[in-house]
Amino acid sequence: MSWQNNLRSVSPYIAGEQAELTDMIKLNTNENPYPPSLQVQKVIEDFKSDNLRLYPSTDAKVLRKALATYHHLNTDQVFIGNGSDEVLSLSFLTFFNSEKPLLMPDISYSFYPIYCGLYHIPYQKIPLADDFSLSVNSYFQENGGIVIANPNAPTGMAISLQEIEEILQNNQDSIVLIDEAYIDFGGESCLPLLEKFDNLVVVQTFFKSRSLAGIRLGVAFGSAEAIAHLYDMKNSFNSYPIDSLAQKIGEASLNDETYFQKSVSKIITTRENFKKELIKLGFQVTDSKTNFVFVHHPKVDATTLFKALYEAKIIVRHWNQARISDWLRITIGTDREMNTVIQFLKEYLKNKEKSY
């Protein structure tokens, strides 16, 4: 058993539960409740299986060009990876190689400190305010890089384009990575700032707003130089991370803008209606610009409520983590699913009142 002495110990990321029961209302991993566009479905139906014997494009050239056109960028400003988690991982490894600490909010995507541990990146967590807002002035200090999810997860809150520009202006010797995984649901993308700042890297994903969680497509945008370094790092690990079908599906999803906008708009409308109903029930709800809400009830322990929802076959997300252990994150599903949640909460809180 001496081989165990040479193991590299890690504390892995704990993903949201993937429920095996089909009658569960799954609102814990921020998946889109609606199917991909018909154009995506047609690509899948028309895909020739014989193509699977060939390696895919190493840099997803056609999809890169489509994304560049969609966002009015040059192709060499686009990087594509196997899901945004891979893109983030490679970005941390590529850009954050300083003895100075990487700055990040204390409440944010829990993969960030895991990457830092894996790659021996020193980091410093900057506390959010009591209302979970972010103070840009806190990032005007010496650092080896900055990573901010905007909108943030799990709080759902966003900072403005002007605030991001202030951070960039005050940190021109560091890479500022903005994780825009949820940007399509109401945040303001900082992609226009790429024209002014070569130290900006923006990461996005296909799975949340385009209903493509199952194919794993993530993307980074930056200066041509930054993206070239990112590809150098990628090619040191895996030359072919994006399979042929995924590349075609990604391209098709960009070609159906009407469906995309309709799907996103529907989720936003459902979210706002759901927030209003939660507030009526006494919940505190953050100003979410994502496809989820972050909620707290002053009279109900979050762990207890999480278990009660689970027993009612409704799965949401809870973290036993400092400052947010009494909060729940609830993905926005269909109107019917969210109405079911509201009806359960009404009954649950009514019974709770009787027991006081």
From Swiss-Prot:
Known pathway: Amino-acid biosynthesis; L-histidine biosynthesis; L-histidine from 5-phospho-alpha-D-ribose 1-diphosphate: step 7/9
GO terms of molecular function: histidinol-phosphate transaminase activity; pyridoxal phosphate binding
Cofactor(s) listed: pyridoxal 5'-phosphate
Pfam family, one: Aminotran_1_2
Signal peptide location: none
Keywords noted in UniProt: Amino-acid biosynthesis, Aminotransferase, Histidine biosynthesis, Pyridoxal phosphate, Transferase
Keyword Transferase: yes
Biological processes per GO annotation: L-histidine biosynthetic process
InterPro entries referenced in this protein's UniProt entry, alphabetically: Aminotransferase_I/II_large (IPR004839), HisP_aminotrans (IPR005861), HistidinolP_aminotransfase (IPR050106), PyrdxlP-dep_Trfase (IPR015424), PyrdxlP-dep_Trfase_major (IPR015421), PyrdxlP-dep_Trfase_small (IPR015422)
E.C. code: 2.6.1.9
Modified residue annotations for N6-(pyridoxal phosphate)lysine: 208
Catalysed reactions listed for this entry: L-histidinol phosphate + 2-oxoglutarate = 3-(imidazol-4-yl)-2-oxopropyl phosphate + L-glutamate
Sequence similarity: Belongs to the class-II pyridoxal-phosphate-dependent aminotransferase family. Histidinol-phosphate aminotransferase subfamily.
NCBIfam families according to UniProt: hisC (TIGR01141)
Subunit annotation: Homodimer.
Protein name as catalogued: Histidinol-phosphate aminotransferase
Lineage, uppermost ranks: Bacteria, Bacillati, Bacillota, Bacilli, Lactobacillales
